[in-house]
Amino acid sequence: MALSTLWLVLMLWTSLFSDSQCSTLSQAELQELEQIHTWVVSRSFPCSVTCGLGLLTQELCPIGVTRNISTSSCKLRTISCLDSWQCGLKTQTATVGRRLVLDCLEEVMEAMGRFSFVVSWRFAFAIITTDDSLFTRYEALSLDKVVLDPLREEDSGTYRCDVLDTGKRRVKRMYKGVKVLSPKDLSLDFAQGLIHWEIPESRFANLTSSRKVYSSSTIRNIVIISVPLSFAIAVVIFIFLFCYSRRARRAAHLCQDNI
């Protein structure tokens, strides 16, 4: 115990009363340091995607240069970024006979190359789900995408895409739900539908009819019957009011005679 205490005191004494000083750089060393190109990240842009592997753009500038993308001294570089490898489920609807492309990597494949990833596809037939036990292996002709051309009703279901990098680390899992409809069942032409609804006379086209609801003879009979009926009702009301007024007057006279 005493030996360790003595050793600690000697170390403190050496550090406090040491005559060592910070060495200064010579002029030649300063010139050599100025020739070294040191780049720092002056600005970083958000990742291109919120899930899965994306691309991130950074601005690199040498030390002492102001932050300005247009400055010739600065340069931009693109690197990969990953916030979350789970992308969840997305659904889309298409009609039979059309061409449908399910892309798993999109811009990342073009930027980093085809052989930087291992892509596998699985398929759950005729159901929209994220239950992995319902998926079976799906052979895609193109590794990074599934091309359905022409689209058939048997192609409806959920497609799952798994992406691994060269280190066998999962960087993306995506679910694509595909609903296939017959062109006779539903028209998905949004532009044509919007034009149709912007025309005022086309909004209630189904409510108009080219033929009359009632014939002219029917209308004439209705008028012939309604006029006498209305007159009779008016006469009855007039007689009722006349009798009521006479009865009221008679009652008033009787009251005066009794007084």
From Swiss-Prot:
Tissue specificity of this protein: Expressed in sperm.
PROSITE patterns linked to this entry: IG_LIKE
Coiled-coil residue windows: none
Main subcellular location of this protein, as a coarse class: membrane
Disulfide bonds: 104-161
Gene Ontology, cellular component aspect: plasma membrane
Chain ranges on the Cytoplasmic side, renumbered to this chain: 243-259
Listed transmembrane segments: 222-242
BP terms from Gene Ontology: sperm-egg recognition
Function recorded in the entry: Essential fertilization factor required for male fertility. Part of a conserved trimeric sperm complex with the essential fertilization factors IZUMO1 and SPACA6 which bridges sperm and oocyte membranes during fertilization by binding to IZUMO1R/JUNO on the oocyte.
Name under which the protein is recorded: Transmembrane protein 81
